[in-house]
């Protein structure tokens, strides 16, 4: 899809061998599994020496702040935040919650890139994640 291609382009443009990609909201869309290398794929980030880790949300849908703190390392270069629930049962993330998460992450590692997959986000609020600290926002195109 166009969104997956935009996400892949943003990831591959900002990550280098030895870098780590972190998802603090659990597993991404299945279309990204091959891009990241969760499912082996030719040309994946994993094939280029980029590692991936994720921190699942807590059972009540809240962020696992302790888990996120422990998952941020020196080589964590980019944090990807999927706004839409996708195929999960969690609620869609509000811009306010995304802002709280980005603030928490940037307080730990100010130079990390926070990228938001804003799929369907334009239908629910009048603010965008860029207004609350996101460095990159994806919605079928890169902003």
List the model feature ranges, each with a label.
Residues 2-143:
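Conserved PLP-enzyme active-site core in the AAT-like
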């Amino acid at each position: 899809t166009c969104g997956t291609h935009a996400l892949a382009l943003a990831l591959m443009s900002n990550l280098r061998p030895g870098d780590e990609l972190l998802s603090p909201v659990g597993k991404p869309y299945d279309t990204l599994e091959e891009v990241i290398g969760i499912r082996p794929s030719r040309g994946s980030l994993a094939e280029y020496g980029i590692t991936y880790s994720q921190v699942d949300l807590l059972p009540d849908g809240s962020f696992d702040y302790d888990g996120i703190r422990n998952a941020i390392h020196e080589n964590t270069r980019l944090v990807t935040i999927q706004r839409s629930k996708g195929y999960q049962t969690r609620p869609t993330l509000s811009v306010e919650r995304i802002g709280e998460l980005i603030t928490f992450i940037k307080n730990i590692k100010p130079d990390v890139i926070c990228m938001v997959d804003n799929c369907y986000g334009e239908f629910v609020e009048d603010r965008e994640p860029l207004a609350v600290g996101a460095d990159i926002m994806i919605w079928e195109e890169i902003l």
